[in-house]
C-alpha cells in the first residue's frame, strides 16, 4: 500500500533484504572482519549489543560472505534449546542423524567437524543467535 505511494521497489526493513542491498557502515564492516578472523583461527567469539544494532544482520552477512570452499556455517536461533537438541540441530545441518543421547551426539558433532576439516579442509562455524535467552543448563 505505502510502497506504491512512496514509489518503493520493495517493502523496506524486512529480514529478507538481499545481502548486497544491506547498508554496511564502517562499524558493521569491522565487526564482520573480526568475526571472519575468529573463523579463520578456529576461535570462540561472543557478539553482544543493544536490540536493533545489527547483530543478526552481521551474522546474515557473514553467512553469505564466508567462502563456502573453506567454511560451513551452522545457524541456530532457538531460545528453548536443550543440550541434546543443540547437538541434534547442528548434526541435522551436517546431514547426520543424531543420537538422542547427549554425550554420544556431542562426540558425533566433534567427529563430523574434525572429518570436514581433515578431509575437505572445511572449518565448521557454529552460530547461536539470541543466545541470551538460553537456559542455564544450555550455557553450561
Predicted regions mapped to residue ranges:
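Short glycine-/polar-rich loops that comprise or flank the Walker A/P-loop
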Residues: 42-43, 68-72, 122-123, 140
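Walker A/P-loop
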Residues: 56-72
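Well-ordered alpha-helical segments embedded in enzymatic catalytic cores
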Residues: 30-34, 58, 108, 112
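Walker A/P-loop nucleotide-binding motif
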Residues: 41-61
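Mid-core helix/loop region of P-loop NTP-binding domains shared across ATPases and GTPases
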Residues: 3-4, 82-85, 97-140
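A short, basic N-terminal segment
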Residues: 1-41
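Residues at the beta-strand->loop junction immediately N-terminal to the Walker
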Residues: 48, 77, 128
Amino acid at each position: 500500500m505505502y510502497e506504491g505511494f512512496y514509489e518503493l521497489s520493495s517493502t523496506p526493513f524486512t529480514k529478507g533484504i538481499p545481502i548486497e542491498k544491506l547498508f554496511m557502515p564502517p562499524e558493521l564492516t569491522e565487526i564482520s572482519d573480526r568475526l571472519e578472523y575468529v573463523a579463520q583461527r578456529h576461535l570462540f567469539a561472543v557478539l553482544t549489543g543493544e536490540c536493533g544494532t545489527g547483530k543478526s544482520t552481521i551474522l546474515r552477512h557473514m553467512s553469505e560472505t564466508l567462502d563456502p570452499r573453506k567454511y560451513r556455517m551452522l545457524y541456530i536461533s532457538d531460545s528453548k534449546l536443550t543440550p541434546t537438541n543443540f547437538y541434534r540441530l547442528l548434526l541435522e545441518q551436517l546431514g547426520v542423524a543424531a543420537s538422542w543421547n547427549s554425550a554420544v551426539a556431542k562426540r558425533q558433532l566433534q567427529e563430523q567437524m574434525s572429518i570436514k576439516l581433515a578431509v575437505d579442509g572445511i572449518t565448521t562455524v557454529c552460530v547461536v543467535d539470541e543466545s541470551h535467552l538460553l537456559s542455564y543448563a544450555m550455557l553450561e
